[in-house]
Amino acid sequence: MEKDKTFKYNTEIIGTTKVHSVKSDYKIRIKNEITYKGLEDDLYRFNIVESLYALDDYEDPIMTQIAEMTNRICSIYKEIEIGINAEGIIEKVFNRDQIRDKWQKVKAWLTNAHPLESYEVIRAKEFELSNEEMEIKNIRFIHFLHQYFFIFRQSVDSGGTKYIKKNEMDRFGAGVVIPVNINLREKDLENGAIERNYEGKMVRDNKVIERLRQFTKDNYMHPEYKMTGKYVYDNITLLESDFTITEELGEFYYNHSYLRLTLEE
């Protein structure tokens, strides 16, 4: 990837979420510009600017309100400059001051638009932004960033398989980190690009399962967390990706998201 060169990406997210008896389908379009800023202290520095975020479809009005608040909070990351290690993990955020300044405006909007509903949300976000380690940890789990860095620089001998362990965050706000075992495969394409495919399933960790059961108030449910993906690279430049995440916590909690990313010509 050429230093200081900007790449434009289009992302489409299609999904279904269910919480108790409320089930909603959603569709989101995102446009991002990503600039590689070079290697700094063994970290690959990237600037990411969101130029479009469109919630095209969300059926349930209550869920729409939640989505509206969530999207407004996420807007503080419309521009983010991050340092990625050789395993694709975010280790540093370079523009934290800019993010905190944006948060003050979002907090004022939340307080005026949704004073009761946003009280606990504001408290939690204030605490997170005051703690750099926690802030970086939560940014790591921003779902669309997976597309760019989930298997960044993870190479495999052609025809072979590589086994990786990753940590994922549950998608229902329980705050539970879910360990996932990944099987990664690679093949060379005729045009010189490299295609990497992976499958991932949660590790059956008893402590994690117990915390998820406490969250759902279901002592007998068996949680499932699965991931699949396909990435096409030219060196470290991502050309396209398909990414699917499915989480099911018993009868009443279900989320399935499909993310499709393409590089603009």
Which residues does each PLM region occupy?
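Acidic, serine/threonine-rich low-complexity disordered tracts
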Residues: 1-84, 153-265
